[in-house]
Each structure stands twice: as structure tokens, then as C-alpha cells.
């Protein structure tokens, strides 16, 4: 059993709970998720099985799309509604136009400080473990990209918005930063991941609908999961070299390929893996046979 299942994660379970459930149903040891969703969050969580766990990082690096709701005037220690309330104030007098302009200003490349309640490690310890002990440490800002952000509804103190962003973006931190910029704080109230790369809600499967009898129906082959990468067909000679880890410098192959592009590599219609052209030649970066 190899491939990817586009699971819709329900509320109140962890991403690892989803992995554990799929492991039990599939009876496969190698199962991995492609990007943590907080327990309170719902949405798209692609799960890789068997040999396809090798492509976890490629899916994890894809752009993400979320639909979120924040509450203005509220600050919690976790930056979401499940945390301890640190501050609360009236947000009813702020102008809707001011809120919309503020949220729109986050579009582009920004530096984001991750929340204390996160799985990031500092000196070998998870931040959430330190936070639970009441310890707050300085976190280094990380460069992220907000490709698009759109306000969907304003019903103060609540604001709903849609965001398309890069890997590593914390929507809880984004909500906190929006509130901070407005001078009154904000907390994430709801979160749904609507897309991870090519995986969307429209083609996701509810976790509770997957069982031992039907799981095979929902498995997407690795090559289809990686369909964003262009395809290249190679002959048996180059295939043998690449499978053995050789960096091919032959111009007959190199002239067809742009530098640094990642490609799906096929030989006689059989998917071999992902390849990339570098200064040293063309090589397989992820062998999948």
C-alpha cells in the first residue's frame, strides 16, 4: 500500500492522532502527515503511506490556504481561544475599514515570530513544553510569505479572512500580529486549512469515512500527488545511471532541462522518482522505485 490520502482532519484531535488511526486501518508501519494542524483546527491533512513517506517534505513545502476567524480585543497565552485569557477589551468602536486595511497590509514577505505554544525546538526542547512550565524565551523571527489575504466578513469583534501563505506560517501568530497592529490584541477563534498544494477540501475524505474495506479507494499514487512537477521521459541507459546515484552530465539529457527545475522522471512510462538539474549534472533527488 503506497500513496497519499487527502484526509479532512476533524476538530479536537491531533495530526498524530490521524496518523495513528490511518496506521491502524491500513496496517502499515510507515505513515506520516504533511504539516501539523492544531487540535482545534480542521481541514486538509494529506497522509503519506509506505514508500510515499519519502515525499512528505515535497508536499509539506507547498503553499497552504486557510480560512480563519479571529476575535479582536482578546489576547490569550496560546494565541487561540483555548488558551488562558491575558487581556480583554471592547473592540466594537474600531472602524471596519481600519480592520480591512490592517489585514491587507500583511500581504507580501514578512518576518513572523512563532508562538510559544509551538513544536519548534530551542536548545533541544519544544517551545510548548517550556510554555507549560511558565517559561517564555526569545524566539527568532522567521521569513514567511503571505501570497494573498482577503477579508471575507467583519462582524465585530469577529473577523473572517482567507489567506494563501508559505510553509511555516502560523495563523495564530498572524491573528496576534493583526490585533497588535490595531492596538487591541486578537486571538484566533477558528481555523480550517482549505488547501495544501494540489490537495483541497473538495477532494478530501472525512477521517470517519475511511475503513479497512475502502481505504485503497482513497489512495492517490505518488506520481499523481506530485503532478505539479513536469514530466520527463528517459531511456534505459540514463535510467540505470540515475538509479545508481550517478549525476548525469550528458548533453543529450541536460539540454532538455532547465537548471534547478524538479521533474518527475519516467522510463518506459514507469515513474522512477524526482530529478533535478544542478551545476554537477542531472540527478535523482528522491528515488521512488
UniProtKB/Swiss-Prot annotation:
Active site positions: 38
Reactions catalysed according to its record: uridine(55) in tRNA = pseudouridine(55) in tRNA
The UniProt record lists the keyword Transcription: no
Enzyme class per UniProt: isomerase
GO function terms (MF aspect): RNA binding; tRNA pseudouridine(55) synthase activity
UniProt-listed GO biological process terms: mRNA pseudouridine synthesis; tRNA pseudouridine synthesis
Sorted UniProt keywords: Isomerase, tRNA processing
One Pfam family this sequence matches: TruB_N
EC number, as in UniProt: 5.4.99.25
First and last residue of the signal peptide: none
Gene3D superfamilies documented for this protein: Pseudouridine synthase
PANTHER family (alphabetical): PSEUDOURIDYLATE SYNTHASE TRUB1, TRNA-PSEUDOURIDINE SYNTHASE
Stated family: Belongs to the pseudouridine synthase TruB family. Type 1 subfamily.
Function: Responsible for synthesis of pseudouridine from uracil-55 in the psi GC loop of transfer RNAs.
Annotated protein name in UniProt: tRNA pseudouridine synthase B
Organism: Clostridium tetani (strain Massachusetts / E88)
Species lineage: Bacteria, Bacillati, Bacillota, Clostridia, Eubacteriales
